[in-house]
Amino acid sequence: IRGENGQKMSESKGNIIDPIDLIYGISLEDLLEKRTSNLMQEGLAEKIARKTKKQFPNGIESYGTDALRMTFYSIATNAKDISFEIGRLKGFRNFCTKMWNAARFINGYENKGNNFEAESESDKWILKEFEQLKADVEDNVNHYRLDLAINHVYEFFWNKFCDVYIEECKKTEKTDNLHPLLKEILIFIHPFAPFITEEIHSIIFKAPLIDR
């Protein structure tokens, strides 16, 4: 695994990042302590401290488990070297925020407990896109290309479901299909982002998703 500057992550370079720190965050002081303690080559401590302060002047932010999980999926390519970038992690944290915002918007409408009924052209379009997503992801997973699978999930949810379909529902004020479609999407995305999908489902549908 290589860091943002392309260098291989190693203790001697002082560029190893503990996944726990990416999930919960860590202060600069604690990060320096972690990176410079118990080094096999104590003379590297000062150099490592300088690099750490430059890269993380305010420590490491909290990104959450699902954002990190999806980031790891996205870099699971067939390449010999894997590059880990904080910017990519931020992108998936934003994706989680997008999921929250979409769910909050949909929760503002009454859940009539109905099934999805493809009446309008936009209904038919999003249903077709969702079926295509399922086929693409199944093929990706069968070929061990989780990077492609998570990219398809990201593209569908952000660009198609949120930016196109939800916006169309706002314009037409036809929102009956939002709840049943969101439910199916949460179930589908659950293996990639289990914590946020479980919580959203529990809040909106008043039932645990994991039982499905």
Predicted regions and their residues:
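Conserved phosphate-binding loops in nucleotide/dinucleotide-binding enzymes
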Residues: 1-65, 79-92, 143, 147
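Helix-rich, typically C-terminal accessory recognition domains appended to large enzymatic cores
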Residues: 59-212
